[in-house]
Protein backbone atom coordinates (compact mmCIF):
# COMPACT_ATOMS: atom_id res chain seq x y z
CA UNK A 1 0.00 0.00 0.00
CA UNK A 2 1.43 3.36 -1.06
CA UNK A 3 1.84 5.95 1.68
CA UNK A 4 2.15 8.67 -0.96
CA UNK A 5 -1.25 7.81 -2.45
CA UNK A 6 -3.05 8.22 0.88
CA UNK A 7 -2.14 11.93 1.22
CA UNK A 8 -4.54 14.38 -0.47
CA UNK A 9 -3.32 17.05 -2.90
CA UNK A 10 -3.97 20.55 -1.50
CA UNK A 11 -5.24 23.12 -4.02
CA UNK A 12 -4.01 26.67 -3.32
CA UNK A 13 -6.10 29.74 -4.21
CA UNK A 14 -6.12 30.48 -7.91
CA UNK A 15 -5.75 26.84 -8.99
CA UNK A 16 -8.72 25.07 -10.55
CA UNK A 17 -9.07 21.43 -11.57
CA UNK A 18 -11.41 20.20 -14.30
CA UNK A 19 -12.35 16.52 -14.52
CA UNK A 20 -13.53 15.07 -17.83
CA UNK A 21 -13.69 11.30 -17.45
CA UNK A 22 -10.08 10.18 -16.95
CA UNK A 23 -8.71 13.48 -18.34
CA UNK A 24 -7.64 16.01 -15.67
CA UNK A 25 -6.83 19.65 -16.44
CA UNK A 26 -5.07 21.87 -13.89
CA UNK A 27 -5.24 25.66 -14.45
CA UNK A 28 -3.32 28.32 -12.57
CA UNK A 29 -1.61 31.69 -12.93
CA UNK A 30 1.43 30.14 -14.66
CA UNK A 31 -0.46 28.10 -17.24
CA UNK A 32 -2.48 24.96 -17.87
CA UNK A 33 -1.40 21.33 -17.71
CA UNK A 34 -3.37 18.19 -18.48
CA UNK A 35 -2.97 14.55 -17.54
CA UNK A 36 -4.70 11.29 -18.44
CA UNK A 37 -5.40 9.31 -15.26
CA UNK A 38 -4.62 5.61 -15.23
CA UNK A 39 -7.66 3.33 -15.41
CA UNK A 40 -6.91 1.88 -11.95
CA UNK A 41 -7.10 5.34 -10.30
CA UNK A 42 -10.16 7.35 -9.19
CA UNK A 43 -10.07 11.09 -8.48
CA UNK A 44 -12.49 13.06 -6.28
CA UNK A 45 -12.44 16.78 -5.48
CA UNK A 46 -13.56 17.77 -2.00
CA UNK A 47 -13.39 21.47 -1.02
CA UNK A 48 -9.83 22.54 -1.87
CA UNK A 49 -8.34 19.04 -1.96
CA UNK A 50 -7.92 16.30 -4.52
CA UNK A 51 -8.29 12.78 -3.17
CA UNK A 52 -6.98 9.88 -5.22
CA UNK A 53 -7.95 6.29 -4.54
CA UNK A 54 -7.30 2.98 -6.30
CA UNK A 55 -10.18 1.23 -8.07
CA UNK A 56 -9.16 -2.15 -6.60
CA UNK A 57 -6.96 -3.07 -3.65
CA UNK A 58 -4.22 -4.61 -5.81
CA UNK A 59 -0.55 -3.70 -5.52
CA UNK A 60 -0.55 -2.37 -9.08
CA UNK A 61 -3.52 -0.06 -8.41
CA UNK A 62 -1.85 1.42 -5.30
CA UNK A 63 1.38 1.84 -7.26
CA UNK A 64 -0.34 3.82 -10.04
CA UNK A 65 -2.31 5.86 -7.49
CA UNK A 66 0.91 6.99 -5.79
CA UNK A 67 2.46 7.95 -9.13
CA UNK A 68 -0.63 9.89 -10.24
CA UNK A 69 -0.79 11.69 -6.87
CA UNK A 70 2.85 12.82 -7.18
CA UNK A 71 2.34 13.93 -10.78
CA UNK A 72 -0.83 15.89 -9.92
CA UNK A 73 0.92 17.52 -6.95
CA UNK A 74 3.77 18.61 -9.26
CA UNK A 75 1.20 20.01 -11.71
CA UNK A 76 -0.49 22.03 -8.94
CA UNK A 77 2.85 23.44 -7.72
CA UNK A 78 3.93 24.10 -11.32
CA UNK A 79 0.86 26.14 -12.34
CA UNK A 80 0.85 28.12 -9.08
CA UNK A 81 4.54 28.72 -8.26
CA UNK A 82 6.59 27.13 -11.05
CA UNK A 83 9.89 25.27 -10.79
CA UNK A 84 13.47 26.49 -11.09
CA UNK A 85 16.81 24.73 -11.60
CA UNK A 86 20.21 26.44 -11.38
CA UNK A 87 23.32 25.22 -13.17
CA UNK A 88 26.91 26.39 -12.67
CA UNK A 89 29.73 26.21 -15.20
CA UNK A 90 33.07 25.66 -13.48
CA UNK A 91 36.25 25.71 -15.55
CA UNK A 92 38.57 28.11 -17.35
CA UNK A 93 36.81 29.59 -20.38
CA UNK A 94 33.48 27.86 -19.68
CA UNK A 95 30.67 30.23 -20.69
CA UNK A 96 26.98 30.17 -21.54
CA UNK A 97 24.79 32.57 -23.52
CA UNK A 98 21.03 32.48 -24.03
CA UNK A 99 19.41 33.74 -27.23
CA UNK A 100 15.67 33.10 -27.40
CA UNK A 101 15.10 29.39 -26.85
CA UNK A 102 18.73 28.43 -27.59
CA UNK A 103 21.62 28.08 -25.13
CA UNK A 104 25.15 28.30 -26.52
CA UNK A 105 27.74 26.61 -24.30
CA UNK A 106 31.51 26.99 -24.56
CA UNK A 107 32.68 24.10 -22.39
CA UNK A 108 36.14 23.13 -23.65
CA UNK A 109 35.23 21.59 -27.00
CA UNK A 110 36.67 22.85 -30.29
CA UNK A 111 33.20 24.13 -31.16
CA UNK A 112 30.39 25.80 -29.18
CA UNK A 113 27.60 23.42 -28.12
CA UNK A 114 24.07 24.61 -28.91
CA UNK A 115 21.06 23.30 -26.99
CA UNK A 116 17.50 24.15 -28.02
CA UNK A 117 15.20 24.36 -24.99
CA UNK A 118 12.02 22.25 -25.01
CA UNK A 119 8.68 24.04 -25.14
CA UNK A 120 7.64 25.49 -21.78
CA UNK A 121 11.20 25.82 -20.44
CA UNK A 122 12.86 29.24 -20.29
CA UNK A 123 16.46 30.11 -19.49
CA UNK A 124 18.38 33.13 -18.29
CA UNK A 125 22.04 33.74 -17.54
CA UNK A 126 22.66 36.21 -14.68
CA UNK A 127 26.40 35.70 -15.30
CA UNK A 128 28.38 33.85 -17.98
CA UNK A 129 28.95 30.90 -15.65
CA UNK A 130 25.38 30.52 -14.37
CA UNK A 131 22.22 29.22 -16.05
CA UNK A 132 18.76 29.44 -14.46
CA UNK A 133 16.08 27.25 -16.04
CA UNK A 134 12.40 27.89 -15.23
CA UNK A 135 9.25 25.97 -16.13
CA UNK A 136 5.87 24.90 -14.79
CA UNK A 137 6.58 21.30 -15.92
CA UNK A 138 8.95 19.63 -13.44
CA UNK A 139 9.66 16.67 -15.72
CA UNK A 140 10.62 18.77 -18.77
CA UNK A 141 12.72 21.08 -16.57
CA UNK A 142 14.67 18.20 -15.03
CA UNK A 143 15.19 16.61 -18.45
CA UNK A 144 16.52 19.87 -19.93
CA UNK A 145 18.84 20.45 -16.95
CA UNK A 146 20.17 16.87 -17.17
CA UNK A 147 20.80 17.22 -20.93
CA UNK A 148 22.75 20.47 -20.43
CA UNK A 149 24.74 18.94 -17.54
CA UNK A 150 25.44 15.91 -19.75
CA UNK A 151 27.50 17.99 -22.19
CA UNK A 152 30.25 18.29 -19.57
CA UNK A 153 29.49 16.49 -16.26
CA UNK A 154 31.71 17.51 -13.31
CA UNK A 155 34.89 15.46 -13.16
CA UNK A 156 36.15 14.20 -9.78
CA UNK A 157 39.76 15.46 -9.88
CA UNK A 158 39.44 19.21 -10.44
CA UNK A 159 35.66 19.56 -10.24
CA UNK A 160 35.44 21.17 -13.69
CA UNK A 161 32.22 20.85 -15.64
CA UNK A 162 28.54 21.76 -15.51
CA UNK A 163 26.86 21.01 -12.19
CA UNK A 164 23.61 21.74 -10.41
CA UNK A 165 24.01 24.57 -7.89
CA UNK A 166 23.01 22.27 -5.02
CA UNK A 167 25.18 19.36 -6.21
CA UNK A 168 28.19 18.23 -4.20
CA UNK A 169 30.95 16.72 -6.34
CA UNK A 170 32.97 14.06 -4.53
CA UNK A 171 36.62 14.90 -5.21
CA UNK A 172 39.41 12.36 -5.66
CA UNK A 173 43.05 12.73 -4.83
CA UNK A 174 45.55 12.57 -7.68
CA UNK A 175 47.71 9.45 -8.01
CA UNK A 176 50.88 9.67 -5.94
CA UNK A 177 54.24 8.50 -7.30
Curated annotation (Swiss-Prot):
SUPFAM superfamilies with a match to the protein in the record: Ribosomal protein L6 (SSF56053)
Sample GO molecular function, one term: rRNA binding
Oligomer and partners: Part of the 50S ribosomal subunit.
Disulphide linkage map: none
InterPro entries the record matches: Ribosomal_uL6-like (IPR000702), Ribosomal_uL6-like_a/b-dom_sf (IPR036789), Ribosomal_uL6_a/b-dom (IPR020040), Ribosomal_uL6_bac-type (IPR019906), Ribosomal_uL6_CS (IPR002358)
Protein name as catalogued: Large ribosomal subunit protein uL6
Gene Ontology cellular component list: cytosolic large ribosomal subunit
Alphabetical keyword list: Ribonucleoprotein, Ribosomal protein, RNA-binding, rRNA-binding
Biased composition annotated in UniProt, kind: Basic and acidic residues: 155-177
Source organism (scientific name): Psychrobacter sp. (strain PRwf-1)
Amino acid sequence: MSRVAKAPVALPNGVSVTLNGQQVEVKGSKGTMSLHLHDLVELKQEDSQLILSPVSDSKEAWMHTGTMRSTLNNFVIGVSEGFERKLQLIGVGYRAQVAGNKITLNVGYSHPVEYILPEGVTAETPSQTEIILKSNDKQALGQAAAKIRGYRPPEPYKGKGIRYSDEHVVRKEAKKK
